[in-house]
C-alpha cells in the first residue's frame, strides 16, 4: 500500500512538473515580444488552442473534483491568458487577432451553455465533457503531423525542437499513467498520441540529424 501511495505521488508530481514546464515554454515567446516589442516569429493560434484545452480540462477537473487537473490547468490557463494579452498588445494588426479571440470566447460560451444548461445530469455531463476534452487534446497532438511530413520531404529536422519533443513525451507518458491509475479513459487515451508522435519525432531526429543539416547547408554555401 505504501509502495502504491509512493508511486501515485510520483506520478502526480511528474504530471504537475512536466506539464507546467510545457506551459512555461511560452515564456520565451513572451520575453521575445517584450524585448523586440513585436510578434515576429511568434504564432498566436497555439496560445488560443492551448487556452481552450486548459479551460476544458479545468472544467472537467472541477466537475470530477480532481485537484491535480484543477491546479495544473488553472496555472496553464493563466499563462495562456498572459501570452494572449501580450500578443494583443504588441501585434500591429489587432483586428484579426481580436476576431480570433472573440470567436474563441463565443465558442467557450456556447460550450458552457450546452454542458451546464442542456445536460443537467452530472454523470452525463462529465462523460460528454471528458469526450470533448479528449478529442480536442488528440487533435492538438496530431496537428503537427504536417510538419512531420515536411521533415520527410525536405529530409531536414530544423523545424523540430528536440527539447520540446522530450517534454512532450514525458508529459504525455505521465498523464497516461495518471489516467491509468485513476481508470479514466479520457485522460489516458487523449495523451497516448503524444507518446506516439514523440517517438516518430525521435526517429526523424535519428534519420535526419540536425548536425547533418548544418553540414549540408555549409557545403551549399
From Swiss-Prot:
Family matches, as InterPro entries: SWEET, SWEET_rpt
Molecular-function GO terms, alphabetical: glucoside transmembrane transporter activity; sugar transmembrane transporter activity
Topology in membrane: Multi-pass membrane protein
Tissue: Ubiquitously expressed with highest expression in oviduct, epididymis and intestine.
Coiled coil regions, renumbered to chain: none
Disulfide bond sites: none
Region described as Mediates interaction with TRPV2: spans on this chain: 149-221
Domain MtN3/slv: 10-94, 127-212
Pfam families in the cross-refs: MtN3_slv
UniProt-listed Gene3D superfamilies: 1.20.1280.290
Quaternary structure note: Interacts with TRPV2; the interaction probably occurs intracellularly and depends on TRPV2 N-glycosylation.
Entry's family note: Belongs to the SWEET sugar transporter family.
UniProt protein name: Sugar transporter SWEET1
Taxonomic source organism: Homo sapiens (Human)
Amino acid at each position: 500500500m505504501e509502495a502504491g501511495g509512493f508511486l501515485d505521488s510520483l506520478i502526480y508530481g511528474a504530471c504537475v512538473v512536466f506539464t507546467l514546464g510545457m506551459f512555461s515554454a511560452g515564456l520565451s515567446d513572451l520575453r521575445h515580444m517584450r524585448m523586440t516589442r513585436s510578434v515576429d516569429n511568434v504564432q498566436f493560434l497555439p496560445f488560443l488552442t492551448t487556452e481552450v484545452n486548459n479551460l476544458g480540462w479545468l472544467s472537467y477537473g472541477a466537475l470530477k473534483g480532481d485537484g491535480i487537473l484543477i491546479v495544473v490547468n488553472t496555472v496553464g490557463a493563466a499563462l495562456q491568458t498572459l501570452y494572449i494579452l501580450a500578443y494583443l498588445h504588441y501585434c500591429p494588426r489587432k483586428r484579426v487577432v481580436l476576431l480570433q479571440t472573440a470567436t474563441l470566447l463565443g465558442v467557450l460560451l456556447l460550450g458552457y451553455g450546452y454542458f451546464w444548461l442542456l445536460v443537467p445530469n452530472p454523470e452525463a455531463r462529465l462523460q460528454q465533457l471528458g469526450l470533448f476534452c479528449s478529442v480536442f487534446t488528440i487533435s492538438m497532438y496530431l496537428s503537427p503531423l504536417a510538419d512531420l511530413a515536411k521533415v520527410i520531404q525536405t529530409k531536414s529536422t530544423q523545424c523540430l525542437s528536440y527539447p520540446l519533443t522530450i517534454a512532450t513525451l514525458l508529459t504525455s507518458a505521465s498523464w497516461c499513467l495518471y489516467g491509468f491509475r485513476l481508470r479514466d479513459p479520457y485522460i489516458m487515451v487523449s495523451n497516448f498520441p503524444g507518446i506516439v508522435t514523440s517517438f516518430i519525432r525521435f526517429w526523424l531526429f535519428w534519420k535526419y540529424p540536425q548536425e547533418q543539416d548544418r553540414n549540408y547547408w555549409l557545403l551549399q554555401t
